[in-house]
C-alpha cells in the first residue's frame, strides 16, 4: 500500500527541510497578501446570498458594541482555521452598508422637510437621500476607511512595529479595512442613529444640549480609535501600538475646551449635507 508523502521529495527531511518549507510558505503568503488582499475585498461582495453568514455578522456587531475584546478574540480562531486575519464573508460589510443606507433615508426625510422648513415633496426627499447616501457611504465610510486602512497598512508593516521573530509576518490591507469597518460601527450607532433620536435635546441651544452633543461626538470618534487599537493589538506579531490611542488624548482636551461654548455637533455636522 502506498502513502502520500508528508513532505516534498526535493527537500530533505528533518529540521533543515522543515525550515526551508516554512520559509517557502511564508514567502508564498507574503506574495499572496501583496497581490490579492485588496481585490479580495471586492470579491467578497459577489458571494451568493445562501453563503452569507448573517448570524455571525449580527453576533460580531453586538459584541463590538458591548464586548469588543470578546469579538476580537474570535478573529484568532479564524486565523487558525482559515489562515488569514481578514474576513472572507461580506455579511458584516453588507449589514453596515444597509444600516448606513437606512440612516440616509431617515436623515434625508429630516433634512428635506423638518430641518429646512421646505415642502415635504417626494423629489426633495429623493434628492436629499442620494446626496446623503453619497456623502455617508462614499465619503464618510469608504474614502475615510481607505485612507485609514492604507495608513495603518503602510505603517504597521514596518519592522519597528514587529517582534524580531515575526519580521516576515504581514498585516493584510483587507484586515486593516476590516478594522476600520469594526471601529466605524460605533460612529454609525452614535452619530447616525442615536444623534437623530436626541435631536430635540441637541437643538435646544443651551448648555445641556451642548454637553450632550459634544459628548456624543467625542465618545464616538474616541471609541473609533479604541476599537482600532483592539483590532491591531489582536495581531500577535505587532508591538508598540499605544500610539493609536493618542487621538483619544487630544479628543479629551478638545472635549473639555468645547464645554466652554464650542458646539461640536454643529461644527462637525455629519448630516447637514
From Swiss-Prot:
Its main location: Golgi. It is a multi-pass membrane protein. InterPro entries: UNC-50. Keywords: Acetylation, Endoplasmic reticulum, Golgi apparatus, Membrane, Transmembrane, Transmembrane helix. One of its GO terms (cellular component) is Golgi membrane. One of its GO terms (biological process) is vesicle-mediated transport. Residues 1-33 are annotated as: Disordered. The modification N-acetylserine is found at residue 2. It comes from the Eukaryota. Pfam families: UNC-50. The chain crosses the membrane at residues 90-110, 135-155, 176-196, 217-237, 243-263. Residues 111-134, 197-216, 264-273 are lumenal. It is found in: Golgi apparatus membrane; Endoplasmic reticulum membrane. Residues 2-89, 156-175, 238-242 are cytoplasmic. Interacts with GEA1 and GEA2. Belongs to the unc-50 family. This is Protein GMH1. It comes from Saccharomyces cerevisiae (strain ATCC 204508 / S288c). The lineage of its organism: Eukaryota, Fungi, Dikarya, Ascomycota, Saccharomycotina.
Amino acid at each position: 500500500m502506498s502513502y502520500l508523502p508528508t513532505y516534498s521529495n526535493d527537500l530533505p527531511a528533518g529540521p533543515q527541510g522543515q525550515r526551508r518549507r516554512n520559509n517557502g510558505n511564508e514567502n508564498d503568503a507574503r506574495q499572496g497578501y501583496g497581490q490579492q488582499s485588496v481585490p479580495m475585498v471586492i470579491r467578497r461582495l459577489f458571494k451568493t446570498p445562501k453563503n452569507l453568514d448573517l448570524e455571525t455578522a449580527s453576533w460580531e456587531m453586538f459584541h463590538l458594541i458591548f464586548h469588543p475584546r470578546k469579538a476580537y478574540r474570535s478573529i484568532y480562531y479564524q486565523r487558525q482555521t482559515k489562515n488569514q486575519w481578514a474576513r472572507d464573508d461580506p455579511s458584516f460589510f453588507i449589514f453596515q452598508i444597509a444600516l448606513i443606507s437606512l440612516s440616509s433615508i431617515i436623515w434625508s426625510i429630516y433634512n428635506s422637510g423638518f430641518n429646512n422648513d421646505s415642502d415635504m415633496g417626494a423629489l426633495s426627499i429623493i434628492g436629499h437621500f442620494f446626496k446623503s447616501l453619497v456623502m455617508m457611504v462614499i465619503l464618510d465610510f469608504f474614502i475615510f476607511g481607505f485612507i485609514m486602512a492604507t495608513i495603518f497598512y503602510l505603517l504597521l508593516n514596518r519592522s519597528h512595529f514587529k517582534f524580531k521573530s515575526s519580521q516576515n509576518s504581514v498585516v493584510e490591507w483587507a484586515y486593516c479595512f476590516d478594522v476600520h469597518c469594526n471601529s466605524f460601527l460605533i460612529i454609525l450607532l452614535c452619530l447616525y442613529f442615536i444623534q437623530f433620536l436626541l435631536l430635540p435635546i441637541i437643538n435646544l441651544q443651551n448648555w445641556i444640549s451642548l454637553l450632550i452633543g459634544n459628548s456624543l461626538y467625542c465618545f464616538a470618534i474616541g471609541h473609533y480609535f479604541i476599537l482600532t487599537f483592539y483590532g491591531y493589538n489582536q495581531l500577535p506579531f505587532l508591538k508598540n501600538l499605544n500610539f493609536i490611542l493618542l487621538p483619544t488624548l487630544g479628543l479629551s482636551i478638545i472635549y473639555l475646551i468645547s464645554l466652554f461654548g464650542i458646539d461640536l455637533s454643529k461644527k462637525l455636522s455629519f448630516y447637514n449635507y
